[in-house]
Amino acid sequence: RTAEALLFELVKAKELGYNMIREHVKVEPAGWYYHCDREGILVWQDMPSGDMGNKWEMHTYNGGTDKNRTQESKDNFSKEWKEIMDLCMPSPSVVVWVPFNEAWGQFDTERIVNWTMEYDPSRLVNPASGGNHRPCGHMLDLHNYPGPAMKLFDPQRVNVLGEYGGIGLPMEGHLWWNKRNWGYVQFKTPEEVTAEYEKYAKSLIKYVRLGFSGAVYTQTTD
């Protein structure tokens, strides 16, 4: 991905009406965050998931199980998470830290979240996007596919839908594997995709009225 391609994707997202990008389980070059600063696009920055999968209890309120990782694994996580934060801190576009995604390797949630909040008290912390919920951090984040749905609500925190959508459209000449295409639902024409996307977007309105604060469409590329 060239610098021009990175900027093109950001500008296109802005033209499509998005005001935030969740940098999902990866880290971009420093120039990408610079472009977000200039274009006025907010960023949620994830920690890339590590270790083995954990017991997933997304719909359990504040009772999720933490994984027992080795001390070496814990130390590596803490070191690399700090390095990611140090890289991104100078960028005002970065407004939310996301230490865990779903329950992938999720461990010592309250300790990690509290450390993150202390290390950077200027930003919000989303403990585990769609993960096992613990009574810490600033946000309660759920995932639901394909259409939007929120099955929990926390009156003490910001409530968000961290992932929904997953609309797939196989395009000849752009497939890396023609036997399988990405997507929770798949369509054959751009018009069908647009209609499905608009249906999901309109259904989000009712959640705004109920007090929910944000939603992340997953995803603009495969």
Located regions from the model:
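A conserved hydrophobic secondary-structure block that centers on an alpha-helix together
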Residues: 10, 15-22
